[in-house]
């Protein structure tokens, strides 16, 4: 949200569709859902104009303005299945990352009953525990699952991530997370990084809502 129109991959996709649209009649049908998978709104019509209107609506619904980044962000994935494993939990990491200061702490609440969710993710983190190394390997040999390892470690360059989860502690460590049993323990650990005077931001639907810094 916010800068979708400035992203190279997005621009390439739009350019590709424009080329296709020169030779074909196209009609777009976009449906926007809420957290319960119910329809919020439907957009239809010209493939690009309808898409732009849908993007504006999504930003209004799921974009949450914030005045400044917080020292500590506490984000819940929003329950099952959004927190079924680390693979899915990474979406909440992405969104909460937008709301935290450099060097801050993000506390993620996620059950992760199915573990990491990807053997390729585990393997990539075991072999290349830095985003630069993972990126270099992906450029040589892109593997689904390993790309999540890059996404996770890239975010960890900015903030400390503490996981409140039923995930096995050894597996959490292998996946580069600090893991604790409850929020109280997470807050005590967070104080090691940000001290005792800090601002907290709560994200009860971390996988859906996107913090947008007010200009």
Model-derived features: positions:
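Short, ordered loop/turn segments at secondary-structure junctions
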Residues: 78, 111-113, 166-167, 205
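Short, small-residue-biased leader/transition segments that mark boundaries at the very start
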Residues: 1-5
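C-terminal catalytic subdomain
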Residues: 83-162
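Solvent-exposed alpha-helices and their adjacent loops that cap or buttress functional pockets
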Residues: 19-23, 64-68, 98-100, 153-156, ...
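Extended hydrophobic packing segments that form well-structured cores
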Residues: 165-215
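Membrane-embedded hairpin module used as a gating/binding unit in multi-pass transport
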Residues: 6-81
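A short, acidic, amphipathic alpha-helical segment used as a generic capping/interface helix at domain edges
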Residues: 53-62, 91-95, 144-153, 181-193
């Amino acid at each position: 949200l916010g800068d979708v129109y400035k992203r190279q991959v997005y621009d390439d996709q739009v350019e590709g569709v424009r080329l296709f649209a020169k030779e074909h009649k196209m009609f777009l049908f976009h449906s926007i859902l809420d957290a319960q998978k119910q329809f919020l709104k439907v957009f239809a019509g010209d493939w690009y104009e309808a898409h732009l209107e849908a993007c504006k609506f999504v930003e209004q619904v799921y974009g949450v303005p914030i005045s400044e980044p917080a020292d500590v962000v506490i984000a819940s994935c929003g329950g099952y299945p959004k927190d079924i494993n680390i693979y899915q939990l990474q979406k909440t990491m992405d969104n909460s990352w937008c709301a935290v200061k450099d060097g801050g702490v993000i506390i993620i609440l996620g059950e992760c009953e199915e573990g990491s969710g990807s053997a390729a993710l585990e393997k990539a983190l075991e072999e290349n525990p830095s985003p630069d190394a993972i990126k270099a390997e992906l450029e040589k040999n892109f593997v689904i699952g390993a790309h999540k390892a890059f996404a996770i470690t890239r975010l960890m360059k900015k903030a400390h991530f503490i996981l409140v989860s039923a995930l096995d502690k050894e597996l959490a460590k292998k996946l580069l997370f600090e893991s604790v049993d409850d929020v109280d323990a997470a807050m005590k650990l967070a104080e090691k990084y940000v001290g005792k005077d800090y601002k907290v931001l709560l994200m009860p639907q971390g996988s859906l809502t996107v913090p947008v810094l007010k200009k």
